[in-house]
C-alpha cells in the first residue's frame, strides 16, 4: 500500500498470540518472545488466531503507543496489571486494562486466558498501524463489534490514513 509522502506500508508482522498466563509464566525464559520496547501495536482477544487476527478471534482491545517512546512493552505491562484488577480508586495505568477487567468479570472469563499478540513492521508509523489493525477487525468504527476501545484510533496526519479506515 502506498500512502504517499514517500512511505510504502508493508504488512504487519505478528508475534503471538499467547495466552496471557503463558506469557507471564515465560517471563524468565530468554528464548520466549517478548514485546519490543517500541514500534508496536497489540491486540487482546478472547480466542486464538493464526498468522494475523480477524474478527473471528473475538477481538477485545487494540492498543499501541505513539511517537518514538520506548514504552510499548511498558504499556503492555500496564494493561496486564489493570486487566488483573491491580488498580484501585481510579489510579490505574491503563483504561483498556480496566475495561478488559470489567469484561472478564461480567463474562466470567479469567484474565489470564485471554490472548495477546503484537505486530511491527518497517517502516513504522504508529497511527497507520493502529488504523490498519482496526480496519482488519471491523468494517467501520460503528460496527466494531466486540472491541472495548472507547475511541477509535486518530487519523494519521502524516500519511493521510483516515480515522478507523484503511
Placement of each model-derived feature along the sequence:
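Boundary/linker segments flanking structured domains
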Residues: 1-60, 64-166
Amino acid at each position: 500500500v502506498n500512502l504517499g509522502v514517500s512511505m510504502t506500508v508493508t504488512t504487519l508482522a505478528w508475534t503471538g498470540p499467547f495466552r496471557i498466563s503463558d506469557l507471564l509464566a515465560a517471563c524468565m525464559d530468554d528464548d520466549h518472545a517478548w514485546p519490543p520496547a517500541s514500534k508496536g501495536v497489540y491486540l487482546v482477544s478472547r480466542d486464538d488466531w493464526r498468522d494475523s487476527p480477524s474478527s473471528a478471534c473475538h477481538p477485545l482491545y487494540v492498543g499501541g503507543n505513539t511517537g518514538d517512546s520506548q514504552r510499548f512493552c511498558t504499556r503492555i505491562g500496564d494493561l496486564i496489571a489493570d486487566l488483573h484488577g491491580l488498580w484501585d480508586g481510579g489510579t490505574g495505568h491503563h483504561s483498556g486494562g480496566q475495561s478488559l477487567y470489567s469484561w472478564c468479570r461480567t463474562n466470567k472469563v479469567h484474565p489470564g486466558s485471554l490472548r495477546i499478540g503484537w505486530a511491527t513492521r518497517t517502516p513504522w508509523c504508529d497511527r497507520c498501524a493502529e488504523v490498519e489493525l482496526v480496519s482488519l477487525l471491523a468494517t467501520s468504527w460503528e460496527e466494531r463489534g466486540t472491541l472495548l476501545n472507547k475511541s477509535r484510533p486518530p487519523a494519521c496526519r502524516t500519511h493521510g490514513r483516515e480515522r478507523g479506515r484503511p
